[in-house]
């Protein structure tokens, strides 16, 4: 995943026809340049999310010159389903048996900012606990596909698609 940060980078990315999948724009931000970018993105069918200044600050790779008005996500499509995520390839994290929503959320956020292409969560969570995990992730699920389901099935699908499986665990007894 690559991020384009600020009006200049996002505009250049659009002009160069990069594979922008999502645009995050600061709610209430207005300028002629920004309007032009948003029109171009909309015309190309690129999903646009309006976020708070805090959202933009958290998601931005560079705040050295202040919080940018706009960010663009290039390459990674957060709307992919599990099969599409596997087909797209890349690095997919699997959290198997994680029990605490906050820990799951931190892992989702870490995967997102480290450049992973998707996250699979195999955990027994209620809807309330899933919402808590998404909140703890700083709502990173908006920017990376997060799949909730059977981890073993996901591993089998990934292996069948040629993925190399690397496992890190501390108490497991099952070899995948």
Which stretches of residues belong to each language-model region?
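Short, charged, surface-exposed secondary-structure boundary motifs
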Residues: 33-34, 59-60, 176
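Short acidic loop-to-helix transition motifs that present clustered carboxylates
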Residues: 56, 172-175
């Amino acid at each position: 995943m690559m991020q384009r940060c600020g009006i200049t980078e996002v505009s250049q990315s659009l002009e160069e026809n990069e594979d922008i999948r999502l645009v995050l724009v600061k709610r209430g931000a207005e300028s002629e340049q920004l309007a032009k970018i948003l029109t171009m993105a909309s015309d190309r069918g690129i999903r646009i999310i309006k976020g708070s200044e805090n959202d933009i600050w958290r998601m931005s790779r560079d705040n050295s010159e202040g919080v940018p008005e706009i960010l663009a996500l290039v390459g990674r499509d957060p709307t992919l389903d599990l099969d599409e995520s596997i087909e797209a390839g890349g690095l997919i994290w699997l959290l198997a048996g994680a029990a605490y929503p906050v820990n799951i959320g931190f892992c989702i956020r870490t995967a997102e900012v480290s450049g992973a292409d998707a996250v699979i969560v195999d955990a027994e969570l209620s809807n309330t606990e899933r919402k808590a995990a998404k909140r703890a992730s700083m709502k990173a699920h908006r920017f990376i596909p997060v799949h909730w389901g059977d981890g073993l099935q996901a591993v089998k699908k990934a292996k069948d698609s040629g993925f190399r499986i690397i496992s890190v665990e501390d108490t497991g007894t099952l070899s995948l």
